[in-house]
From Swiss-Prot:
Its main location: cytoplasm. GO terms for molecular function: acyltransferase activity, transferring groups other than amino-acyl groups. This is Polyketide synthase 5. The active site is at C157. The gene is PKSG5.
Amino acid sequence: MNHLRAEGPASVLAIGTANPENILIQDEFPDYYFRVTKSEHMTQLKEKFRKICDKSMIRKRNCFLNEEHLKQNPRLVEHEMQTLDARQDMLVVEVPKLGKDACAKAIKEWGQPKSKITHLIFTSASTTDMPGADYHCAKLLGLSPSVKRVMMYQLGCYGGGTVLRIAKDIAENNKGARVLAVCCDIMACLFRGPSDSDLELLVGQAIFGDGAAAVIVGAEPDESVGERPIFELVSTGQTILPNSEGTIGGHIREAGLIFDLHKDVPMLISNNIEKCLIEAFTPIGISDWNSIFWITHPGGKAILDKVEEKLHLKKEKFVDSRHVLSEHGNMSSSTVLFVMDELRKRSLEEGKSTTGDGFEWGVLFGFGPGLTVETVVLRSVPINY
C-alpha cells in the first residue's frame, strides 16, 4: 500500500489572505463603538475601553460589519438582545465568500488548475450551518463536485495550526493530493453593546478583526509545472495545557457568540510553551530557541510579551506576529497564516537566504480554547534570487 502514499514531507505550496474592505482605526474606535451602540452616556466605561484599545498595540482592523449593517439590524447593538438569527443570516453568506477570496489568491500563486485540488478543509468559529461553509466555498470556487471536504466549526484561535496538521496528514497519505485549507472568521458574531458587568466583552471588541487565509498543501512538489515549496511541514502536535480549563472559551447563545478570556492566559502559555518546544525539537537536536524562526498566533500583546520574556527571545523573533497584530488585530484561526505569509514576504524583501528569515528550522504556534496549543515544526526553503 506504500505506493498510495507520498514520498517525503508535505509542504505549503501557496498562501492567500483576504480581509473585508471596511477598516476600523483603533484610535477612533472607542468613539465609534460607543456612538453606534448608543452608549455614550457610559462615560467611565468608555474611558476603560479607550485604555484597553490604547494598550492593544493594534493600529487598525478590518471589519465586515459596518454602520449601514447596524442601521439595518439595530438590535445587534443591544447587549443581550436575541439576535442569533440575524447574525447567522449574514455570516452563512459572508464567511464562505471571504474564504473564497483568500482561496482564489492562493490558487493564483500556486499556478495550477483548480481541478488538481483533491481536498478542501475549512474552519470557522463565526457560523454554523448545513451544508457548511466548505460546501459553499467549493461551489463559489467552482471546485469539482468530488473534492473531498472537511468542515471544522468552533476551533477558534488554534484553528490555523489544526488545518496545517490535517492537511499534512492527508497530503502525505494520499499520493498526488493537493489540499486547499482555509480559515475564515468574521466577528459580527460577537459585536454587541457594552455592559458594566462584562469587561471581557470589551477586550473582544478591542482586539478582534475579520480575515481569511488559505494555503495549498502537497507532498512531492512538481517543479516541472512550476510548483515550489514555501515551508516543509516536518511534524505536528496538539496539547491541552494543564490547569487551563475555562480560560479561553466561546459560547453560542441567543445574543450571539459570548467570549471568555481569563487574565491568566499569557502566564499559562508562557509557563508551558517550552515543554511544547522541547517535545517538538529534541528529535532534531535543537534547544536554542533563538536559532529558529517563529510563526506565532498573536492572540494579544501580553501573550507575545510573556513568551518573549520567558524564553529570552530576541525582539526580532516576533516582528511578524506583532506586525500582523498591529495591522489586522486578532482574526482568530487565520491570524497565524497571515504571520506565515508576512514572514516569507519579509524574508524575500530583506534578502534573507531562506523563507524563514534566513533560518532553516522554525515553529508555528496556535493558541485557543481549551486552552489548546497546536505546534508545527517547519523547515524553510532556500530563496533563489
